[in-house]
């Protein structure tokens, strides 16, 4: 049996339970064809680069498959018929990656905050602490410009 990575995009108006039901449905297709499903990663709702079937966002899901080609073809056939699936792509790989995918790692990186691993802003001793913005000198309004 060959190893595959399969990603599919489901419509944004589905609930999370409906997306999980789709995953279980296609997992059943693979298992009935004699294959196995490894990890399943739900990447959540993401914005699309362009509209697909009048949708600007979609649920992204990754599945690692160890299945014969016939089972994968049957799953792809059923996905092509389903109105809930916007796009899908299956890629044959030599080995499945260990640990979380690059998409999940990127999501974890964003949770660290704006400055990442650099920590909070520091005060530079030679300049002193930053002053609050409201202490700036008052700005001239447009009404003041005409008086001169």
UniProtKB/Swiss-Prot annotation:
CDD domains: bS6. Binds together with bS18 to 16S ribosomal RNA. Residues 97-148 are annotated as: Disordered. PANTHER family: MITOCHONDRIAL 28S RIBOSOMAL PROTEIN S6, SMALL RIBOSOMAL SUBUNIT PROTEIN BS6M. InterPro entries: Ribosomal_bS6 (IPR000529), Ribosomal_bS6_sf (IPR035980), Ribosomal_S6_plastid/chlpt (IPR020814), Transl_elong_EF1B/ribsomal_bS6 (IPR014717). One of its GO terms (molecular function) is structural constituent of ribosome. Belongs to the bacterial ribosomal protein bS6 family. This is Small ribosomal subunit protein bS6. GO terms for biological process: translation. GO terms for cellular component: cytosolic small ribosomal subunit. The gene is rpsF. Gene3D superfamilies: 3.30.70.60. Keywords: Ribonucleoprotein, Ribosomal protein, RNA-binding, rRNA-binding. It comes from the Bacteria.
């Amino acid at each position: 049996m060959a190893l595959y990575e399969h990603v599919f995009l489901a419509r944004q108006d589905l609930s999370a339970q409906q997306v999980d039901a789709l995953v279980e449905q296609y997992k059943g297709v693979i298992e009935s064809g004699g294959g196995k499903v490894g990890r399943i990663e739900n990447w959540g709702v993401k914005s699309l680069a362009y509209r697909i079937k009048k949708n600007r966002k979609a649920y992204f899901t990754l599945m690692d498959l160890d299945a014969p080609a016939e089972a994968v073809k049957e799953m792809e056939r059923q996905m092509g018929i389903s109105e809930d699936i916007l796009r899908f792509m299956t890629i044959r790989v030599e080995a499945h990656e260990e640990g979380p995918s690059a998409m999940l790692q990127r999501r974890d990186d964003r949770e660290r905050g704006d400055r990442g691993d650099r920590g909070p802003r520091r005060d530079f001793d030679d300049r002193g602490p930053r002053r609050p913005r409201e202490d700036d000198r008052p700005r001239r309004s447009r009404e003041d410009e005409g008086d001169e």
